[in-house]
UniProtKB/Swiss-Prot annotation:
InterPro entries: aa-tRNA-synt_IIb, aa-tRNA-synth_II, aa-tRNA-synth_II/BPL/LPL, Anticodon-bd, Anticodon-bd_dom_sf, Gly-tRNA_synthase/POLG2, Gly_tRNA_ligase_bac, GlyRS-like_core. Its EC number is 6.1.1.14. Keywords: Aminoacyl-tRNA synthetase, ATP-binding, Cytoplasm, Ligase, Nucleotide-binding, Protein biosynthesis. It is an enzyme of class 6 (ligase). The keyword Cytoplasm applies. This is Glycine--tRNA ligase. It comes from Nocardia farcinica (strain IFM 10152).
Amino acid sequence: MEKSRVAPKSKVDTVANLAKRRGLVYPCGEIYGGTKSAWDYGPLGVELKENIKRQWWRSMVTSREDVVGLDSSVILPRQVWEASGHVATFTDPLVESLITHKRYRADHLLEAYEEKHGHPPANGLADIRDPETGEPGRWTEPRNFSGLLKTFLGPVDDEEGLHYLRPETAQGIFINYKNVETTARKKPPFGIAQIGKSFRNEITPGNFIFRTREFEQMEMEFFVKPGEDEQWHQYWIDTRLAWYTDLGIDPENLRLYEHPKEKLSHYSTRTVDIEYRFRFQGSEWGELEGVANRTDYDLKTHSEHSGTELSYFDQANNERYIPYVIEPAAGLTRSLMAFLVDAYAEDEAPNAKGGVDVRTVLRLDRRLAPVKAAVLPLSRNADLTPKAKDLAAQLRKHWNVEFDDAGAIGRRYRRQDEIGTPFCITVDFDTLEDQAVTIRERDSMAQERIALDKVEGYLAQHLIGV
């Protein structure tokens, strides 16, 4: 008889504490009490973000001949959002608990119930307990709540100056489709990619940096001939899933979620989410990225509303068509969170007293690690320190390198392990004699003696693709 297994505990809270303690992520406005809906990225967090963006851009744009980049405005003409359907349909069902007077998305409550019990609630919201008190729920009737964040341009806050902060980067791509096709001399199949901030008036932000009102997206719109869309859709689902595993995510912690037909967005014929097993309370899986077949909806609606022809004329086949669009849309900070959670580990390391200590280590892929190497003089010494600083300065020409001379060497190793630094380089008293240093690898803790003039080449060999 198989023994029942206890579900592994979520590492999200542990990782969140580490992120705050080591300067990856800070609560926004912490000196004023902070807010659940926004976070600031510290010195290490911004490096990790940039590394993720760099790997995405390399994978999606610079390594391909059929994709180019774009950086469109955050505030687009209001007509864009009216044409796209966002003003009319970008709403969520909002309910309020009559017990705590807190507001929730009704669809999230229903989905959480179904995930926990394996079936939808027989009596709808009436069967759902209050998330905060656990009491049988008493809810208001659902009402629609706009996810668009409004702003006003010009001297007067009136209807004429009403604009929206973009809820997605995609529309900036669609309205530039013709510009890019013409100036970059592209023809379907080809893609336009961009990375940028988007804003959504989320009812219930939370789960650390997972759901926020201001967030960063990595999106690409791939324009294809109608009839070839299903084949390209599957290609991008497979390609995007492989990107996460190539950067170190355990395949066991990833899954594909097919949106039911009745829950598809108004523009989509098929959407598949790439989800990560975060093990949130009440929801085991969380979406990292959606890959949607948006059909010809976007170019068609913008063509109709703007009066601009957004079709493509295929000279080889003497036919004109409006391209279909395949959209891989990833959340940058959700990816960052998944990489951190998946990389977090605890193991044992020898200490100075001959025993072992529990060490925390982020086993991040070297391409993502915020700091690539740390230079550590064995002690603060008039001979060692200048040599170590010179080495760090030389290596900084190529990589993000830390210099740390504070505390016992074992403690300094631990500090680098828990931020994911792949290599620690120790300058010791033997260095003064043999002109060599000790390089320690993060995961195995194995050490090698390398000549000073070979250190740069050693790191270059082990940090390919960063």
